[in-house]
Amino acid sequence: MTTKTTDETFTVDCPICKKAVIWSPQSPYRPFCSKRCQLIDLGEWAAEEKAIPCENADFAMDPENNEDWAKH
């Protein structure tokens, strides 16, 4: 959740542990509260525990489209 505090300061919840994080240069890992939470999130993406939803991924299975990708 994002909340606005005084003087245009925003606070967001860390996506991993839900701790409040001030959205400013003093929080270098934002939106995460720490390097640890940032790495946990990265690990979840790398392990394919998280993904961007897609209705149809036929383009990945189409050999004609795959040829184009292989040339690069």
Curated annotation (Swiss-Prot):
Q: How is the cofactor bound?
A: Binds 1 zinc ion.
Cofactor dependency: Zn(2+)
Q: Which GO terms describe its molecular function?
A: DNA topoisomerase type II (double strand cut, ATP-hydrolyzing) inhibitor activity; zinc ion binding
Q: Which keywords label this protein?
A: Metal-binding, Zinc
Q: Where does Zn(2+) bind?
A: C14, C17, C33, C37
Record has Amino-acid biosynthesis as a keyword? no
Write one Pfam family the protein is assigned to: YacG
Superkingdom of origin = Bacteria
Any one Gene Ontology BP term: regulation of DNA-templated transcription
Q: Which family does it belong to?
A: Belongs to the DNA gyrase inhibitor YacG family.
The UniProt function text for this chain reads:
Inhibits all the catalytic activities of DNA gyrase by preventing its interaction with DNA. Acts by binding directly to the C-terminal domain of GyrB, which probably disrupts DNA binding by the gyrase.
How this chain assembles, per its entry, is: Interacts with GyrB.
Read off the NCBIfam families from this record: PRK00418.1
- State the name under which the record lists this protein: DNA gyrase inhibitor YacG
Organism, scientific name: Mannheimia succiniciproducens (strain KCTC 0769BP / MBEL55E)
Phylogenetic classification of the source organism: Bacteria, Pseudomonadati, Pseudomonadota, Gammaproteobacteria, Pasteurellales
